[in-house]
Amino acid sequence: MRVSAVAVAAPASGSGKTTIATGLIGALRQAGHTVAPFKVGPDFIDPGYHALAAGRPGRNLDPVLVGERLIGPLYAHGVAGADIAVIEGVLGLFDGRIGPAGGAPAAGSTAHVAALLGAPVILVVDARGQSHSVAALLHGFSTFDTATRIAGVILNRVGSARHEQVLRQACDQAGVAVLGAIPRTAELELPTRYLGLVTAVEYGRRARLAVQAMTAVVARHVDLAAVIACAGSQAAHPPWDPVIAVGNTARQPATVAIAAGRAFTFGYAEHAEMLRAAGAEVVEFDPLSETLPEGTDAVVLPGGFPEQFTAELSANDTVRRQINELAAAGAPVHAECAGLLYLVSELDGHPMCGVVAGSARFTQHLKLGYRDAVAVVDSALYSVGERVVGHEFHRTAVTFADSYQPAWVYQGQDVDDVRDGAVHSGVHASYLHTHPAATPGAVARFVAHAACNTPRA
């Protein structure tokens, strides 16, 4: 099925992409459309707001994590049942992963993904502090790369009617259509912390109200008919299929419990789909207040912000003990970033699960970026020597016991030969976030281990 899309990009971060993209998703839905929302890059937070606006899962399109060949199929899978897609970009339009030499065209940029899908770009321009200069900016972005088509501009944070008039004249001079002009509106600001926006799950009811406000403002100030008219795509791609990706390798049904709630909010929609395709029953539990579901054979602990909830996580000693006992019985446990912090003995002095011997602490040092990683040892997910591309995104540090076996060794500039994570028995825990669609064998292997082991909580 061919579904047209628009990519919402900007000259730089902080221009209002998430606000405009989320509001556009909500406004199109309010107008009767079924909208498929996407985010370029590995970001887990923005898709949570997209999902609130669209009423369906937000998904990621990241050619660095999954490769170029999967972008079209993952897009086709994600738009099933929709009549239009909105793709929120990352950073500036042409910003992505910089090669070792620097200065090369950046892989994984919004422009890269838009070109792969044939999606026109709507540029969000922060109009504060400028007027006629917008013409030069638009001219530069429109002519920089012939593979990227700027279909229109949405002017954000416009100061007055006179300011808007001058800006529109500048856009006309550059030959770029104005699709909307958003006034400066304080109510559209979302809360942030050291790793970006506060997640929609944590923000709760206020997140829903914020999305409603974004929707109302975009519906009032953006020409939705013009947006729809400029949407486009290349020929239809065959949709990605989780069943074909993993095959049904489980010898018997297995129950996989995935941590959720406010502390564990990072995950890709395709992960649960692939676990089910591999034969698992997927159930969620909240480690802040719940115990493991009855009959749990394996546990997935995704990323999130456990350092915001250390006392609450520590206080639920029942589920901590259950996870420890399940891991000790050889059950597969897959933990990424927040999950790793939850599995160690203590986090900032608070007792955690004690599955991985070591301690973790919050720091002021940001570790952020793509990582080329090689599996150090066979595990419940990967074979020794298997290569993956993942993403690191945290401000914490773990000190492991001397006898630990690392999960990964990183390769590449600035991180060459860095060890990450820990593997023992059925446990695979590390800082590295991976996209399951890129490593379907790991998902199939995890479920097969769960079905064979079946210690059951």
Swiss-Prot record:
The a and c carboxylates of hydrogenobyrinate are activated for nucleophilic attack via formation of a phosphorylated intermediate by ATP. CobB catalyzes first the amidation of the c-carboxylate, and then that of the a-carboxylate. The active site is at 337 (nucleophile). GO terms for biological process: cobalamin biosynthetic process. Pathway: Cofactor biosynthesis; adenosylcobalamin biosynthesis; cob(II)yrinate a,c-diamide from precorrin-2 (aerobic route): step 9/10. The keyword ATP-binding applies. It comes from Mycobacterium tuberculosis (strain ATCC 25618 / H37Rv). One of its GO terms (molecular function) is ATP binding. The keyword Magnesium applies. It catalyses: hydrogenobyrinate + 2 L-glutamine + 2 ATP + 2 H2O = hydrogenobyrinate a,c-diamide + 2 L-glutamate + 2 ADP + 2 phosphate + 2 H(+). This is Hydrogenobyrinate a,c-diamide synthase.
